């Protein structure tokens, strides 16, 4: 019994020391010193070589150092752990992207999504790389799938709002942007999104001498079936409903500014 208690205490002390070294290493990396962070992580790995987050942090440090091949090699060793997470695949895919190999990056994100189908982060990265290649519809589809599976992950709303701002369906830029700002009520991204939404309002609501026009949505034909007619289930597209609401709200105004938007 005494021996078991001693072994248990030693194991607990080891893990506490490992976690302390890990925290110090992360702090060093955050302060721009990945090399010293790697030194501490190596010390920690000698105490607990099977604690995979240490190897992940080391791979991250090499990514910060722009030694992407080393980062990939380390991170791929973590695939074997049943309890590894989606961030491992995100790191590997991002490194391939930094190496100007988007095809491999997308392949890694897809592999990660098979294992972690509810990963908002992997759908985000997949969308960003697709967008950088000019595949805008695929990018938005990835962001929206990420929103569907991980609704509390704000970055997919952020990217979707940015893409829709340059489309004929700005209504979705407004909706996704507002949700993102609720999820991130402060910080640089909140400020950036506030400015984007304001620009959308300025370009989407135009006043003339005696009227106001609203343009947030491109009207498109909708398919109506006999069953829908018989059931009385014919609805206007959301964009059309949004435009009608904006038209009514802007009726008594003469300009778009912070004061009118807050009335």
Residue ranges and their predicted role:
Residues 54, 88, 122, 156, ...:
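TPR alpha-solenoid repeat register
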